[in-house]
């Protein structure tokens, strides 16, 4: 038995095809029809890092999108000039979208994407923010910029899955089911840029493990007020390490109790996401990092031999006394409704609450709401803090490209993206 406020059927992925490379690419090309333009605006989008794991996921999500049209694909120099189907080692369980298969891969330079209205970045962190990786010209003067910043400076709207700008004080770090209001800082980001930008900005989505954590925490803070303390232990899927990822001899028959930088990301990102935006004396906007009600987060992160789906065991302490009961927590989680109405890729139900004692499980629950929702189970009293429970989220969907896609949809609906 599960509860989402209404009956929900867990969606399974579309039919699979064999995971072959470019030699058999023609058999991996999707022939599915697009939505008509009557479904919404026709917005040209580009994908950076299109041959990588996150880039491939972006293309799967964009293939039949009612608003966004795949217009440009960028990748590393070894792929530039090739048709996408011949450049990519396709690793998704659905075919290569037919819209992308014959597109010629472009070099990741802003001038090659200038006719796009939105750019999705699936670049690895070491490229997304590495000085000297990308070049472009203004008034014939060569400039060396951080890669994603170069696209912003070219007045392009960038939605990034990389970590590089998450700590920037003017860049929103958005989990769309949690803090879409943080898009309000974008005009300030544009105004502070030199020259001032009309259309360009950067929005980042959170680390995959942070995303699964903050959605239930947001639901609980909305229902019961501030949370004071969070203890979280993660069991993270190997797909979170990208491809080819963790060597098989390291992960088979094993658990690796360390993921570099992961714990620090969870502890810091949670504060920025769940915090608000305040105004300083000079009228500028600042992320308050949950300072009005200090929140402490302690994370322990582990890599486990699961392909997709991050599991997290969480204990929380509320500021309110007495704290809510386990039943009140279950009801609040099931009733949670995020501010994503009108977004085509947003889940109808953000959280499913399981009553069975052995749920959620990655194999059974990672495709809830097509991977865009979060599963919660084992809600019970905690003898050290107040309440403890288990979270399961799909790290390659809501934990990565799906979040970035919904962020872009929100930006369109709120008029942040100029179309």
Model-derived features: positions:
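C-terminal active-site/capping subdomain that shapes the small-molecule cofactor and substrate pocket
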Residues: 298-303, 308-419
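Oxyanion-binding "anion nests"
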Residues: 262-315
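Alpha-helix boundary/capping residues
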Residues: 135, 273, 277, 333-336, ...
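N-terminal Rossmann-like NAD(P) cofactor-binding subdomain of oxidoreductases
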Residues: 2-258, 292-296, 320, 342, ...
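Short secondary-structure junctions and interdomain/linker hinges
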Residues: 77, 126, 262, 277-281, ...
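A structural signal for well-ordered alpha-helical scaffolds and beta->alpha junctions
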Residues: 144, 213, 263-267, 326
